[in-house]
Amino acid sequence: MNFLLTWIHWGLAALLYLQSAELSKAAPALGDGERKPNEVIKFLEVYERSFCRTIETLVDIFQEYPDEVEYIFRPSCVPLMRCAGCCGDEGLECVPVDVYNVTMEIARIKPHQSQHIAHMSFLQHSKCDCRPKKDVKNKQEKKSKRGKGKGQKRKRKKGRYKPPSFHCEPCSERRKHLFVQDPQTCKCSCKFTDSRCKSRQLELNERTCRCEKPRR
């Protein structure tokens, strides 16, 4: 019984869809009913009709429900009021500022398994406006951040104290690895200590900073 009711519901939905399609084909396009084949459309009318506004647009259901790939929808697209059109500046784009949801009955089919009429919600636009494009806005924000950063860096550089640089002569040209040099005083000291040399039964030569055999 339920199966029969589903098919009746399906048949009625298909009939209504076909009738509406025939009516839409027969009805003249908005503003085109009295137009002559070679008539030139005036600038003001072209401008008004092409400017940013809400207009009925056929939207693919999979565009709105990308995760429901296991289903087939009938119809596969739905008429929705969406923002479209041109703005007076290339840096602006037509975007929705007021939106609302509309519920539609859609035939939802799972091949070889089930089919039913489902209530599906879609977003419609009720008001549009020309706003700065995202990429332009991001570039402006980056520029302002860069400008602030540069100013701060300059201030830091100006306020930073640079101590005078000292250049010390090397303690030894050949045996640099044996010496440790203080960069501020340029004083040289031996890397190895006397106790280390004595542990090897040697003596520290403070001039060469090497562990040598004791003199007798």
From Swiss-Prot:
Residues 142-161 have a biased composition (Basic residues). Gene3D superfamilies: Cystine-knot cytokines, Vascular endothelial growth factor, heparin-binding domain. GO terms for cellular component: cell surface; extracellular region; extracellular space; membrane. InterPro entries: Cystine-knot_cytokine (IPR029034), PD_growth_factor_CS (IPR023581), PDGF/VEGF_dom (IPR000072), PDGF/VEGF_growth_factor (IPR050507), VEGF_C (IPR027928), VEGF_C_sf (IPR036841). The gene is VEGFA. Residues 132-167 are annotated as: Disordered. Glycans are attached at residue 101. One of its GO terms (molecular function) is growth factor activity. Disulfide bonds join 52-94, 83-128, 87-130. One of its GO terms (biological process) is response to hypoxia. Residues 1-26 form the signal peptide. Widely expressed. Abundantly and equally expressed in heart and liver. In kidney glomeruli, brain and yolk sac, isoform VEGF-166 is 5- to 10-times more abundant than isoform VEGF-190. Keywords: Angiogenesis, Developmental protein, Differentiation, Disulfide bond, Glycoprotein, Growth factor, Heparin-binding, Mitogen, Signal. PANTHER family: VASCULAR ENDOTHELIAL GROWTH FACTOR, VASCULAR ENDOTHELIAL GROWTH FACTOR A, LONG FORM. Pfam families: PDGF, VEGF_C. This is Vascular endothelial growth factor A. Homodimer; disulfide-linked. Also found as heterodimer with PGF. Growth factor active in angiogenesis, vasculogenesis and endothelial cell growth. Induces endothelial cell proliferation, promotes cell migration, inhibits apoptosis and induces permeabilization of blood vessels. Binds to the FLT1/VEGFR1 and KDR/VEGFR2 receptors, heparan sulfate and heparin. Belongs to the PDGF/VEGF growth factor family. It comes from the Eukaryota. Residues 132-141 have a biased composition (Basic and acidic residues). Isoform VEGF-190 contains a basic insert which acts as a cell retention signal.
